Amino acid sequence: IKGYDPRFGIYKLGFPNLEVEEGFVKYLLPFYTSISAAKTPFEIGRFVQEVESGNYDAFFRRLQSFFADTPYEVIAGQKPERDTELHYQNVLFIVFKLVGLYTQVEYHTSNGRIDLVLQTNQYIYIMEFKLNGTAEEALRQIEEKGYALPFSGDNREVFKIGVNFSSET
């Protein structure tokens, strides 16, 4: 045993070589547990580690995979454009809350509302969402409305993230 993550109850095992590791994964692990060697694209422990380490590129790739796997019937309602953007905002809010991260949606500032603010011990993520727009438009809104200003007195690193969701993909 090389390590243990008490938060998720995960042990990190070390193997002397690839042959021993493959034997463990293929033969012993399935025999003693109901765990398969396959991992889902949205493995919650890895997602949390990416967020907490500031690896926003990796966690957004993981989210993109997660959203691509969402059945289209559960997304759009009476106002498809607005409902779709709200769907993505709600899913992100729920995911971040479920993993125990401090998350706020529609965070009010003196110049508008930030779609989502996510805070960890080291980072603050300011996220603005666009549907069928561009990430650049979302970033421009963060800048023009001064969404980072309320956090300027905080010593944590601030990430400004513009996110575009496509209703086509």
Walk through the language-model features, giving the residues of each.
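C-terminal structured domain segments across diverse proteins
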Residues: 127, 141, 159-162
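Nucleic-acid nuclease catalytic cores
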Residues: 135, 148-169
